[in-house]
C-alpha cells in the first residue's frame, strides 16, 4: 500500500462530498422544528484526546492547545507527571456545518498531522434519526531524528474511524471502529484494527463526566 493511493482516494472522497453538500444543506434546512438535530451530544469536538461527533460551524476556526501528562509514580519529583507532558498545537476549521478539517503538531516524536471529518447523519430531537454518524480520516508524519536513517515513507501513518453516537437525556455514548495503517516495509503487518468507546454524563448545567 502506498501513500499516493490513499491521498488520491481521500481527495476524490472530499470532492464527491463537497458537490453534494449544497443539496444536503437545503434538505436539512427544510426540516420541521421537531426534526432538527439535537445539540451538544458532547461538550467539544474532542472527548478526552479522541474526536467526538461535535462539529465546528461553517466558517469558524478554532486554535487548540492539548496536553497529555506523564505517569504520577515519580510524585513531586516531576510534579506528578507534569514534567513529562506532551503538547499538541492545532487549528480546526469548519468548511461547512458537516465538513471539518484541521492540522497540528505534537511534541511527542515531533509529529505533524492533518485530519478531515464528515458528518452524514445527525440524531434528531424527535428521534426519527436515532444516531449521529460520521467518518474521520487522519494522517500523520513523524519528524524525530534517530541515530539511523529511517526511510521517508515509514514515517507516515493513517487512521480511518467511523464515529457513531447516541444521546439519551443526560447520557451520551459513542463507539469508534478504527483502521490504522503504518507505512512500514512490506514484510511487516502494517494494518491494525480496533474499536474505541466514550461516555459523557451531564451531572449539572456546566459539569460533565467524560470517559474515553
Enumerate the predicted regions with their spans:
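Short helix-loop boundary/capping segments
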Residues: 183-195
